[in-house]
């Protein structure tokens, strides 16, 4: 293979320190600096979280441009690359980026005269951008760069570049292990290592078109794929997963659903069949819905009918006989039916519920339940509760108590006497009951003022509360604005 000349760009980067005077970090974990140039990521050693951060790290980045003819082409291609610096603190779980700095690789490698501190010195200082965890001024990065563009032979240089790339992307070693690295390198130089030839072979193989190799699925994948339904397989057919046929290793028993025989027609009349019909229709819609094709559904299942269905029918017959014997009017029977509908759907299997053996509400509370007025009132209240969106637990009816009637009459008499006191100017204010309402700014609203102005206490009280809340809101807004101005 003939050797072709190419241009190689090398960057020697020396990172000195990161300074940020007067800034103290809240976290005490170590910090390191991550650098990305030519798409190659490298990082410095970790240092304590105390400014200034002294790194004194030296790194070399190299990249070959086989299509470049002159250095101008290399510089033009560097405009599309970005040099990135990230100051990262080892805060669990994945670390926290404190500040960053990014610049065009061309301007980073070949800075202008105003970006260099001295005429013969290549030291540079750039201001990084704060992200989080830093309070105060932005940190400043001090480093120096040396850039060289040279010619190389692409056939022999590829092996060397691959070797250097593997070495540079290795984890950063600690200083005490440098001696071991030097001895190992000297031994590798003395002996003819086959690694370089291996890199050359890999580079030649990389030029050839690559082909994907198929692997047999793992047992877990095989087991999971066997559990997919036929609908899911049809959905995955356009992915061309291959002609592999997934077969079950062991035949599993079918999915079992325990089912109870349907109740007798009399029980359906008691509980109401429309609810079950709606539930059955919803279940059929769920099975026939094409939006659930990706969900797992068993292909076959059995229905096991238990002998407890007979007990269920017997309990329903007992319940029906009990309700028919206890019912005294048609509205009461409808109320009982609604009560049964609100109970849980699961019924006892072996014996009827002990609730059926309890005494009725009439026997427990000793009230006249069978009167037509009470039954109509109960029926109307149940209708209102069912129509409302927010049904609260409340009493079905209120018993008429003579003591309550007396209290209402007493309150009416007091109100009438209060109005009579207001109309009588000779009646002393110390002898009559006070009905004044405290307003804002030391004002009071009395019954006499209400009778003169034709306004009751309620709207006056609401206006007073509106003024009070409006003043509180203004005070809160002014206090917030004062605090913001102080900050």
Swiss-Prot record:
Q: What does this protein do?
A: Required for formation of the sperm connecting piece during spermiogenesis. Sperm connecting piece is essential for linking the developing flagellum to the head during late spermiogenesis. May be involved in myosin-based microfilament transport through interaction with myosin subunits.
Detail the disulphide connectivity of this chain as listed in its UniProt entry. Answer: none
Chief location of this protein within or outside the cell? secreted
> What is the name listed in the Swiss-Prot or TrEMBL entry for this protein?
Spermatogenesis-associated protein 6
Tell me the first and last residues of the signal peptide: 1-17
Gene Ontology molecular functions: myosin light chain binding
Source species of the chain: Bos taurus (Bovine)
- Region named Disordered: 170-221
Sequence positions bearing Phosphoserine: 216, 218, 264, 273, 324, 342, 345, 353, 423, 464, 486
Q: Give Gene Ontology CC terms.
A: extracellular region; motile cilium; sperm head-tail coupling apparatus
Any one biological process term the GO annotation gives = cell differentiation
User: Which residues have a glycan attached per UniProt?
Assistant: 181
Q: Where is this cross-link: Glycyl lysine isopeptide (Lys-Gly) (interchain with G-Cter in SUMO2)?
A: 247
Q: Where is the composition biased (Polar residues)?
A: 205-219
Similarity comment text for this entry: Belongs to the SPATA6 family.
Identify the keywords attached in UniProt to this record, alphabetized. Cell projection, Cilium, Developmental protein, Differentiation, Flagellum, Glycoprotein, Isopeptide bond, Phosphoprotein, Secreted, Signal, Spermatogenesis, Ubl conjugation
Q: How does it assemble?
A: Interacts with MYL6.
Database matches in PANTHER family: SPERMATOGENESIS-ASSOCIATED PROTEIN 6, SPERMATOGENESIS-ASSOCIATED PROTEIN 6 SPATA6
Protein's cellular compartments: Secreted; Cell projection, Cilium, Flagellum
């Amino acid at each position: 293979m003939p050797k072709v000349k190419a241009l190689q760009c090398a960057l020697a980067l020396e990172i000195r320190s990161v300074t940020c005077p007067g800034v103290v970090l809240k976290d005490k974990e170590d910090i390191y600096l991550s650098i990305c140039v030519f798409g190659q990521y490298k990082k410095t050693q970790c240092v304590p979280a105390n400014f200034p951060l002294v790194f004194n790290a030296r790194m070399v980045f190299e990249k070959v441009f086989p299509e470049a003819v002159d250095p101008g082409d290399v510089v033009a291609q560097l405009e599309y690359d970005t040099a990135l610096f990230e100051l990262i603190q080892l805060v669990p779980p994945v670390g926290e980026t404190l500040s960053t700095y990014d610049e065009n690789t061309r301007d980073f490698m070949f800075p202008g005269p105003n970006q260099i501190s001295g005429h013969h010195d290549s030291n540079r200082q750039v201001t990084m951008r704060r992200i989080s965890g830093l309070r105060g001024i932005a940190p400043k990065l001090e480093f120096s760069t040396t850039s060289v563009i040279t010619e190389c032979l692409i056939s022999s240089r590829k092996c060397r570049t691959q070797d250097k790339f593997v070495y540079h992307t290795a984890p950063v070693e600690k200083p005490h292990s440098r001696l071991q690295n030097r001895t190992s390198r000297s031994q590798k130089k003395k002996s003819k290592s086959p690694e370089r030839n291996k890199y050359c072979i890999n580079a030649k193989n990389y030029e050839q078109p690559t082909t994907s190799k198929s692997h047999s699925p793992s047992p877990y994948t095989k087991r999971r794929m066997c559990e997919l339904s036929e609908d899911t397989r049809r959905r995955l057919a356009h992915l061309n997963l291959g002609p592999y046929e997934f077969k079950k290793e062991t035949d599993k028993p079918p999915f079992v659903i325990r089912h109870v025989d349907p109740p007798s027609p009399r029980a359906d009349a008691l509980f109401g069949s429309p609810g079950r019909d709606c539930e059955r229709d919803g279940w059929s819609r769920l099975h026939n819905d094409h939006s659930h094709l990706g969900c797992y559904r068993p292909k076959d299942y059995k229905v096991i009918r238990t002998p407890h269905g007979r007990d269920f029918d017997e309990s329903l017959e007992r319940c029906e006989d009990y309700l028919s014997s206890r019912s005294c009017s048609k509205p009461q029977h409808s109320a009982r039916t609604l009560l049964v509908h609100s109970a849980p759907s699961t019924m006892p299997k072996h014996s009827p519920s002990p609730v059926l053996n309890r005494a009725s509400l009439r026997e427990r509370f000793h009230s006249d339940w069978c009167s037509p007025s009470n039954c109509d009132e109960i029926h109307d209240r149940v209708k209102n509760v069912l129509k409302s969106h927010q049904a609260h637990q409340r009493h079905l009816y209120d018993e008429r108590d003579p003591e309550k009637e007396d209290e209402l009459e007493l309150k009416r008499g007091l109100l009438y006497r209060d109005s009579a006191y207001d109309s009588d100017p000779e009646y002393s204010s110390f002898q009559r009951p006070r009905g004044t309402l405290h307003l804002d700014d030391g004002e009071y609203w009395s019954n006499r003022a209400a009778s003169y102005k034709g306004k009751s206490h309620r709207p006056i009280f609401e206006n007073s509360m509106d003024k009070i809340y409006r003043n509180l809101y203004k005070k809160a807004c002014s206090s917030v604005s004062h605090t913001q101005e102080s900050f």
